[in-house]
UniProtKB/Swiss-Prot annotation:
It catalyses: tRNA(Tyr) + L-tyrosine + ATP = L-tyrosyl-tRNA(Tyr) + AMP + diphosphate + H(+). It is found in: Cytoplasm. This is Tyrosine--tRNA ligase. The keyword Endoplasmic reticulum does not apply. It comes from Thermococcus onnurineus (strain NA1). Its EC number is 6.1.1.1. One of its GO terms (molecular function) is ATP binding. SUPFAM superfamilies: Nucleotidylyl transferase (SSF52374). Keywords: Aminoacyl-tRNA synthetase, ATP-binding, Cytoplasm, Ligase, Nucleotide-binding, Protein biosynthesis. InterPro entries: aa-tRNA-synth_Ic, Rossmann-like_a/b/a_fold, Tyr-tRNA-ligase, Tyr-tRNA-ligase_4, Tyr-tRNA-ligase_arc/euk-type, Tyr-tRNA_synthase.
Length: 375
């Protein structure tokens, strides 16, 4: 496969940003070992924003010949008080429910879960020279910068936090270099940590990424954050700045069950959540249901997406591109309820293999139901 085609696969939807395309091209041209990683905190149920968005991108990377890795961030989850801050429970969930759920998500999005390496953070954090890398990074970043970066944990600047949380950004950057990662992958909300990684890459003394004597900068790949289904706290949205802020604030959240569809939700749960979804008629700029259609259904174009309607409401209509769907919705030719029902039916069918898996292997899900789910 030529370099141009590899770049197309890596930058296609749901990629929202690549820092930078020029650096990616350089790494491919010099034949640097291409190692991807995406790290996850272990907390509640896996929703579509985690499972399908990451799964889709992993599938693309595999097609481009990139080695893929999922980093099960147990220590990071402990620092960020996930699952009650109980490290033993976090590790148990990571190696059962979360690992199996991500494998099934990757599979339904066209990837090969058997070609994904799963690494538990403890396996590398318990090695002494990992912390040497953390210190090396920390010596190249100001305290003020680290404090601004705590938003990667879903924390707000100015929020009262324990000191361990200030170590978190340096650990996340160290994860990249210690594992020799050339493609650091995450949602857009992790951007601050990745920018630090790019900036310190050529200053590091320990575990810098090198190829033929050249210190390399990693590429940062950020996928789209699916919007949560709930109505935003401010409506209508009047400014572009307000819209950008809301996009991150209103992402899908496992702590707000009706904002998210989980990968193992029943057909009735999926229908119910979509029926209640915020989907104003003719609104195409901020519309969670359209957002899901764009990044899940129309990830590959052209495709065929049929919306079934009674003849008196125009009959069935089939769209092959997202722009066609968006145009009809903007012009009022497509009713919100018809869109919601069609997206729900698509998701029910897409997620059937995941539901089937957890019906045959109920133990991981039963474990999750026994644990108090925290944000």
């Amino acid at each position: 496969m030529d370099i141009g085609r590899k770049i197309e696969l890596i930058t296609k939807r749901p990629t929202e940003e690549l820092l930078t395309v020029e650096n990616l091209r350089h790494l491919l041209e010099i034949g640097a070992p291409m190692q991807h990683y995406i790290g996850f905190e272990i907390s509640g149920y896996i929703h579509l924003g985690t499972g399908l968005m990451a799964g889709a991108k992993i599938a693309d990377l595999q097609k481009a010949g990139i080695k893929t890795r999922i980093f099960l961030a147990d220590w990071h989850s402990w620092i960020n008080d996930k699952l009650g801050g109980d490290l033993e429970i976090i590790q148990k969930v990571a190696l059962t429910y979360f690992k199996e759920g991500m494998k099934q998500s990757i599979k339904v999005m066209g990837g090969d879960p058997d070609k994904v390496e799963f690494v538990l953070a403890s396996e590398i954090l318990e090695k002494g020279d990992y912390w040497q890398t953390v210190i090396d990074i920390s010596k190249n970043v100001t305290l003020a910068r680290m404090m601004r970066s705590i938003t990667i944990m879903g924390r707000q600047m100015g929020e009262a936090i324990d000191f361990a949380k200030l170590i978190y950004p340096a650990m996340q950057v160290a994860d990249i270099f210690y594992q020799g990662v050339t493609i650091a992958h995450a949602g857009m909300d992790q951007r601050k940590a990745h920018v630090i990684a790019i900036e310190v890459a050529q200053k590091l003394k320990y575990h810098a990424i090198e190829h033929n004597g050249e210190k390399l900068k990693p590429v940062a790949l950020h996928h789209h954050l699916l919007l949560g289904l709930q109505e935003p706290p401010v409506w209508p949205i009047e400014s572009e700045e307000q819209y950008k802020e809301l996009k991150t604030q209103m992402k899908m959240s496992k702590s707000k069950p009706y904002s998210a569809v989980f990968i193992h939700d029943t057909p009735e749960e999926i229908k119910q959540k979509l029926r209640k979804a915020f989907c104003p008629a003719r609104e195409v700029k901020y519309n969670p249901v359209l957002d899901w259609a764009e990044y899940i259904i129309f990830r590959e174009e052209p495709t065929e997406f049929t919306i079934h309607r009674p003849a008196k409401f125009g009959g069935d209509v089939t769209y092959t591109t997202f722009e066609e769907l968006k145009r009809d919705f903007a012009e009022g030719k497509l009713h919100p309820l018809d869109l919601k029902n069609a997206v729900a039916e698509y998701l029910i069918e897409l997620l059937k293999p995941v539901r089937d898996y957890f019906e045959k292997h109920p133990e991981p899900l039963e474990l999750m139901r026994e644990i108090k789910i925290t944000r």
